[in-house]
Amino acid sequence: MIRHARPTDAPTLARLQTYLREPSPGLLDAALDADAYSPATVLVATADDDRPVGYLLAVPGDGTTYVAELVVDPDHRREGIATALLSACAARSERLTVTVAPDDEAARSLYRRCGFEEARRLPDFFADGAAILYRR
């Protein structure tokens, strides 16, 4: 099931965030803080017991929504969870963009399967190198 994140999900999402190459803890914290103004949205994929097993952090921008973070628990990968999160995000936004490390073939393959196309290369985007910008 896909739902909006709740503040009570924060510990589980923080654990999931550790699987990301370059996490943004401040952005996730702000998106989950009901008292903070943040345009970011966090969608959560849950197991049968409503425990988060993946999430997508989306930030709306000028005519597009940027997928800032997408992560699935390693024990639940290859179950269609990332695809479901992207589909739920796409249902709320006409255009999506995402940046991916060139050597992250699993992520690049996922985004291509979900209809994203490579828009351009961004040198020195990540702390450890370049990124590819994908659009859908």
Locations of the language-model features?
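Acetyl-CoA-dependent GNAT
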Residues: 4-77, 83-87
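C-terminal "cap" of GNAT-fold acetyltransferases
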Residues: 6-7, 97, 101-105, 114, ...
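Short glycine-rich hinge loops at helix-strand junctions in the catalytic core
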Residues: 80, 115
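Conserved acyl-CoA
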Residues: 84-96
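Conserved short alpha-helix immediately C-terminal to the canonical SAM/SAH-binding motif I
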Residues: 85, 104-107
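Structural preference for long, well-ordered alpha-helical segments within the folded cores
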Residues: 88, 109-110
